[in-house]
């Protein structure tokens, strides 16, 4: 597979593309299971009136922080259905925490499993889905991710 630019063709490699250019799922059947953990953190900017409504539990949609936590956990559990070529993983733990600041909300998702492949995508999906809950139509998003070893 190559990507064409105006001056040249650049070969592109991916672990999800075989030598014939076919899309493949990575074979992890020979990898030994091990304890795996990943943490992802994301931010959504909202207006000061939304921050006040969230803090005072006056949102029209109810307790949005609890709903966002549940949505994040459900999102992490559904990662293989949402993102192509992700292995379905039995999560052994998923924790979503939310922190309201003066300009928005931080969501942190930590996912854990015992298996042959990592849970980075589950943590990223969990944090992202938790942040999809917003009263305003126009919001800015800034996503940061960080992975940590399982202890």
Show the residue positions of the predicted features.
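C-terminal binding/interaction regions
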Residues: 2-4, 10-65, 70-87, 91-138
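Positively charged, low-complexity/disordered segments
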Residues: 140-151
């Amino acid at each position: 597979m190559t990507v064409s630019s105006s001056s040249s063709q650049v070969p592109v490699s991916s672990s999800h593309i075989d030598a014939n250019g076919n899309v493949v799922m990575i074979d992890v059947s020979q990898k030994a299971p091990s304890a795996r953990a990943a943490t992802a953190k994301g931010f959504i900017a909202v207006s000061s009136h939304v921050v006040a409504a969230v803090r005072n539990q006056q949102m029209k949609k109810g307790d949005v922080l609890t709903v966002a936590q549940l949505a994040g956990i459900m999102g992490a559990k559904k990662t293989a259905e949402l993102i192509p070529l992700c292995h379905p993983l039995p999560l052994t733990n998923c924790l979503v925490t939310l922190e309201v600041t003066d300009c928005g909300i931080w969501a942190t998702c930590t996912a854990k499993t015992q298996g042959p492949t990592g849970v980075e995508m589950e943590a990223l999906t969990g944090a992202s889905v938790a942040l999809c809950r917003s009263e305003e139509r126009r919001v800015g998003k800034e996503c940061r991710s960080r992975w940590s070893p399982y202890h």
